[in-house]
Amino acid sequence: MEIILKEDVVNLGYKNDIVTVKSGYGRNYLIPTGKAVIASPSAKKMLAEELKQRAHKLEKIKKDAEAVAAKLEGVSLTIATKVSSTGTIFGSVGNIQIAEELAKLGHEIDRKIIVVKDAVKEVGAYKAIVKLHKEVSVEIPFEVVAE
């Protein structure tokens, strides 16, 4: 019996896979629990159309991320913060401060996609990575200076 999986099933396949299973397993478990549907010609056609639309949508999201990456490519930030006499920052500089500085420059970036490798606790030059898409990321250099 051929079926189309509606969700990931362990040891069988992933969502939208067309797999062959024994009739009893498909009829008595997978289909009643909503994990699969029978792979009729019309269901296969609908699956192909859905996958085509999803691929088109994902391509558009990736192009948008690449456009934002192109805008961020030459950006360099300077973050002024309060510093002790030994050169240590009061607190630390993280993704929130970087997102605020980018917003001042006109780039609205969610702070959750900005990654700073280590805690920035001293004055100096550092790099942050903005992960716009799983395949698109931009490295932004920033410098922490005393106020």
UniProtKB/Swiss-Prot annotation:
NCBIfam families referenced in this protein's UniProt entry, alphabetically: L9
Entry annotated with the keyword RNA-binding: yes
GO MF term list: rRNA binding; structural constituent of ribosome
A Gene Ontology cellular-component term: ribonucleoprotein complex
Superkingdom in the source lineage: Bacteria
A biological process term (GO) from this entry: translation
Family in the record: Belongs to the bacterial ribosomal protein bL9 family.
Its job: Binds to the 23S rRNA.
UniProt keyword annotation of rRNA-binding present: yes
PROSITE patterns tied to this protein: RIBOSOMAL_L9 (PS00651)
Protein name according to UniProt: Large ribosomal subunit protein bL9
Entry keyword set: Ribonucleoprotein, Ribosomal protein, RNA-binding, rRNA-binding
Gene: rplI
HAMAP family reported for this sequence: Ribosomal_bL9
